Amino acid sequence: MPEKNLKIVHTTLLEIAYEDGGPRDGSPVMLLHGWPDAPRGWNSVAQAIHAAGWRTIVPYLRGSPPTRFLSQGTPRFGAAVALAQDAIDLADALGLDRFAVVGHDWGARTAYTLGALFPERLSALAALSVGYQPRGIFKVPDFGQSKRFWYQWLQCIDGGAEAIRRDPVGFARIQWDTWSPPGWFDEDEFAATAEGFSDPDWVAITLNSYRARWVQGEEVDSRYDSLQRRLHEVERLSTPTLMIQGASDYCDDPKESENLERFFTGRYSRLLLEGIGHFPHRESPIQVAEAVIRLIQDAG
């Protein structure tokens, strides 16, 4: 396991904690964790990236301690445009003009949003477990995928949201238990990852992220309105992109990420990993790392 080198930067809204690893002079690769997860999920992939000569920047996303909001009055807004702006703010604070981005789940959605809104900042883009959604528009899926999204619908009723507030760790554990074939994690790893899940901001960001997709009148943060409008205008991405999908992903049906090539003007490829579920970077880190390294090398 790579040594944790935890650092802090301040932005207008956040104190962002991030792990900085690999050669200091290596080309930067930003690794964005998903939900429910934490930066430690990238440990094995990060080691391989370091061995290839690159530097990794692995932030704790908003809501995930030790990242924290500077003001209690800031809306706990969990939309991808906010997460993308956080990533840009972090890159600006570190003086990174361009970087490769690799994201899983929420991190994948954030990576696509970066590709839509800030393509000039990206050298390459890898997205794990979530297919691209043109214009950032959420549509109610077919009944099969809607069944998989039960956890999103639960959050959209007040009683469900209250149940999650009472036991966020238990709620997260159900996802780990059911989104992949069994046997991919142990109790110690889940416990270490879930340390931040009881934080009130983790719960607030979780609920806002999902409720704002489907529930009218959910709290938003108006400072991101212009980014949201721009996102709705972007259908095609130009950044060289790799999509990695587990063939046994029981959260996001693999068919949801098929046949998306037409939305990419740059190079695009999709890698389907047999026997792998929703957490490819944890379940098959060597395959993921090798694919990401090839992407970054080919992107130049």
Residue ranges and their predicted role:
Residues 2-4, 15-16, 28, 64-98, ...:
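Flexible "cap/lid" subdomain of the alpha/beta-hydrolase fold that forms the substrate-access gate
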Residues 34, 105, 282:
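Conserved acidic functional residues
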